[in-house]
Every structure is written in C-alpha cells, then in structure tokens.
C-alpha cells in the first residue's frame, strides 16, 4: 500500500528523534523505482505498476510532511530495474532541542508509563516482519493491513507538546511506537514492567490481547514519569488535545508482564529477553560482485555521440521538478536552499540546508 507505506516512512522518522525530545524541522526523501514509463500491461503478476507505486508513494510522503509542517528540501528518485523487486523509500530528518529540555534518567520501581497520542487498531499488525517476508501474487490483496494508517495532525500535536520544556523535563525516559508496538515501545523502557492492555485506547472494539500488544498503529509515544508528575503531564497533554493514559508501572522484579481481561497473558524474564532469541547463521554467495554502478560510464571518440544520447535519454537525468513541487520546502521559515535554483530555477540543489528552529526571535545558525 504505497501511500500509507511512504507516510509511515516520514512519520516514523519524525518520532525517532521525538523520543529523544528533539523537534524535527528538516527532511529529505530519496526513493528508488523501476521504469515508470513501462506500459501497465507489462506489470508483473501480483505487483502494482511502477508508475502507480512511484506517484502514490510520493503523495503519501508529501501529504504527511506537508500536513505536519515539515520542510522537505531535497527530493530525488532513482530508477533501476533492481527496484522492481524491492522499492526504496528513504526518509531522513534532522531534529534539534535545547539541551536543558532533555532529561535522561533510569526508571525506578513505582514509576509509571503513560501512553499518549493515537489510538490502537489492527493496522500494522505484523508490519515489521511483513516488510521482510516473501511476497506472492496474493500479497497485494492480503497484506495491505500490515501497513499502518498515519495521522499527521495527531503527530503534530505531539511535536507541539514536546517543544514545551516544562513537559519534557518531567519525562525520565521515552520511546516511540514502531515495530512491535506495545511489546517493544513499552517493553524496552525498564527491566521490570507490568502492563495492563485493557487500558490501551482502541480505535474500535474486538481486538484481542495479542493484537493490542503487537499492533504498530502510528502516532503513539510511551513516556516514563514519576507518580507525582502524572497529573501535571496529563494536564499538559489535554491542553494539546492529546489522549494520555497510564498503562503500565515499573516493577522491582525484572519481568515483562502483560495483563488482559483479568488474565496474565505474558510473563517473561528480562534475562531471557536480553538474549535476543535464537541466533541464525547462514552462508551467502555473492553472485554479482563485479556488477558496475549505473553511473560508471566510459566513452570514446568513436562512440561519444551515441553515449551522450544514452545519458540524456536515461530517466535518471530527466527533470524531477514535477516530483519536487508537491513537497513543501519552505514551511517553518528555516529553509536556506530550495530544491531548485539557478537562473531559471531548474538546477537541482545538491544538499538540504536549513537554519536551526527557534520559537522566539531570529537565528542565523
């Protein structure tokens, strides 16, 4: 599902620095596709056409970035037959925060974990493993639910909340919800945890304990705070219209415990979890070690004209202005270099350059 997949790319990239209390203000997108000019009739069975994937993914990424107010100042798509089997969707971001707003402390027994942001649904169940497993002709019909459904406005509210130093200084430790859902986002915060899955806000009824625990629904954060700071933190969340609920406590016993409908459905020792499961060792054979990079070209006097025409007719050398213009590159008033420059505003910029974001006054940094 290209739209949701690309939106998840940028949404997840924003939440990673956000868990460190950083405000993301700068983004770039580099993607890879097959031949987008190929006839749709030549599309491989069970695959979406390359032009559909390319366009839909671009709109998914730009839609999320534009709504959340993130300047994307470098956008480039590369074309190569290898991207037909596995598309590339790369989102890179830069974030910053005042040093005094960042507190990193070890959780202690009695501390509580607050889940804030979006609600939990079945979207994204199995997403982390789904992106790596073998795809078949049925995948396009059966695997769509593995892609999370993003909500940029919800994440924008969390960004606003985390720019408030009075709020972030209450946080001892933070994690964003990504692969593995509650199991990972909350499970990584402390050695001993007791999680009540019935307290996790749901998008709709009918989810079982396993689905609640592993759902990768977006726009969710988990934070560790002291018991005496819960009311103040939740009150600040309410000011930004963000749902915030206490769902877990830190325990002395180093076990990850989950309760659902009055039953204990998970009880694992931390020392077992820290082994990271079974280690797999496989033998690999590199079959194309001598492959040449697409841009490694040679020419001669005799073939110069033909080689020049080959370069100019390559999709990788076509103007990407149409793609770049759907991304907001100036929101936030920190942009130094726009994606296109030069006398005719057609020359691609080779770097993403922006000033640091400040809430008051003007900066030249």
Please place each PLM-identified region on the residue numbering.
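Glycine/proline-enriched, intrinsically flexible loops and inter-domain linkers
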Residues: 1-365
């Amino acid at each position: 599902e290209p739209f949701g997949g690309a939106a998840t790319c940028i949404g997840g990239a924003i939440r990673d620095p956000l868990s460190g209390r950083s405000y993301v203000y700068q983004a770039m997108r580099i993607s890879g596709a097959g031949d987008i000019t190929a006839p749709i009739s030549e599309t491989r069975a069970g695959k979406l056409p390359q032009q559909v994937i390319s366009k839909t993914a671009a709109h998914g990424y730009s839609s999320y970035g534009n709504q959340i107010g993130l300047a994307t100042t470098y956008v480039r798509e590369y074309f190569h037959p290898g991207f037909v089997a596995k598309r590339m969707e790369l989102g890179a971001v830069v974030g910053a925060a005042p040093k005094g707003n960042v507190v990193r402390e070890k959780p202690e027994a009695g501390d509580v974990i607050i889940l804030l942001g979006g609600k939990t649904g079945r979207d994204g169940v199995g997403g982390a493993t789904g992106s790596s497993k073998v795809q078949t002709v049925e995948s396009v019909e059966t695997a769509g639910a593995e892609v999370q459904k993003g909500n940029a406005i919800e994440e924008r509210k969390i960004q606003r909340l985390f720019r408030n130093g009075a709020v972030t200084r209450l946080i001892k430790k933070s994690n964003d919800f990504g692969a593995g859902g509650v199991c990972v986002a909350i499970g990584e915060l402390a050695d001993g945890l007791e999680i009540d899955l019935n307290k996790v806000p749901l998008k709709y009824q009918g989810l079982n304990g396993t689905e609640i625990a592993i759902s990768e629904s977006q726009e969710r954060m988990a934070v560790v705070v002291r018991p005496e700071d819960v009311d103040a933190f939740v009150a600040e969340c309410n000011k930004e219209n963000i749902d915030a609920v206490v769902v877990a406590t830190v325990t002395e016993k180093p076990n990850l415990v989950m309760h659902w409908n009055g039953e204990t459905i998970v009880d694992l020792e931390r020392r077992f979890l820290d082994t990271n499961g079974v280690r797999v060792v496989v033998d690999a054979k590199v079959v194309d070690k001598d492959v040449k990079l697409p841009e490694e070209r040679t020419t001669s006097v005799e073939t110069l004209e033909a080689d020049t025409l080959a370069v100019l007719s390559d999709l990788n050398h076509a103007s990407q202005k149409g793609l770049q213009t759907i991304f907001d590159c100036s929101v936030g008033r920190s942009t130094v270099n726009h994606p296109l420059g030069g006398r005719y505003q057609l020359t691609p910029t080779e770097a993403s350059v922006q000033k640091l974001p400040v809430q008051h006054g003007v900066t030249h940094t």
